[in-house]
Amino acid sequence: HSVAYNKDDVSAVDENTETVKREVLDWITKLYAKHFTKVPLVINYHRVLGHPTSQGTANPNSESLVALAISNGYCIRSDAFGMNNSSWGYSTWEKAIAAQWRYKVPIIMEGGYIVSSHSYWNDPAGYRQGHPEDVRQGEFDSSAEARVNMMDFRVGQETESWFNDAFSLVQRFVSEGGYRLYPDQVIVPDQVSAGSRVKVASRWRNMGWGYFPNNLPQWNYKYKVAFALIDASDKAQKVFVDKDCEPSTWVESKPFSY
């Protein structure tokens, strides 16, 4: 939740802190990106990112630090969804960051409250004591607003709470969350002559909240739309890759025709 730059005083802040924060974040994110080239990398978007203290008003440099991590190949996540405290929860600053990077990098959600041990009923949202489903609903609503690609249900009792207290929300995310790509229209001729040219038209939609992160540097647009001419034995005799189709641009259920 915080980063210490002084071994003698882990919460120390001085005139060099902001410079050192940026240098350290740039170094560590580039180091990970250098060695983890095939899997997505993720960093928390937090109002005091990389700071010696873990709460308070948003640091004016935090937004640029998030952008720095993203430029080095990172996705973003928050582990404070459902918390509405303006000092350390998921509030105006975090929502603005999510809106800024929506459909550009994946956003991952984790709830802030452990309902079995945290006093979630003191939250400004007015969650009722003894009603963990209120917390789950708050987390879900913030996730929908942020258009998250993934919801982290944690482990143990937290996972059980999602399935026992708010299973309908789990079902909704399964059907609505992340990316949901499908061709809602494909036009091909029913007969073709050998050696002739064939025109294929397709229309695609993403029915999910999120987007398909084909643009991540670790994936580098490797997922493509392709059409194949298949013989009677189901063997592809010819494959055509449509280079004009880019699934990372398909968002908000809009039709994309090619």
Where would I find each of the regions flagged by the language model?
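Structural beta-strand segments of beta-rich domains
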Residues: 196-200
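Short coil-to-beta strand junction motifs in C2/discoidin
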Residues: 212-226
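Catalytic cores of secreted or luminal carbohydrate-active enzymes
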Residues: 136-191
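Catalytic-core regions of glycoside hydrolase
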Residues: 4-157
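A beta-strand/beta-hairpin structural motif
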Residues: 237-258
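Short, acidic/polar linear motifs in exposed loop/turn regions
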Residues: 206-210, 233
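Residue-level recognition of well-ordered beta-strand positions that form the cores
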Residues: 201-205, 226-228
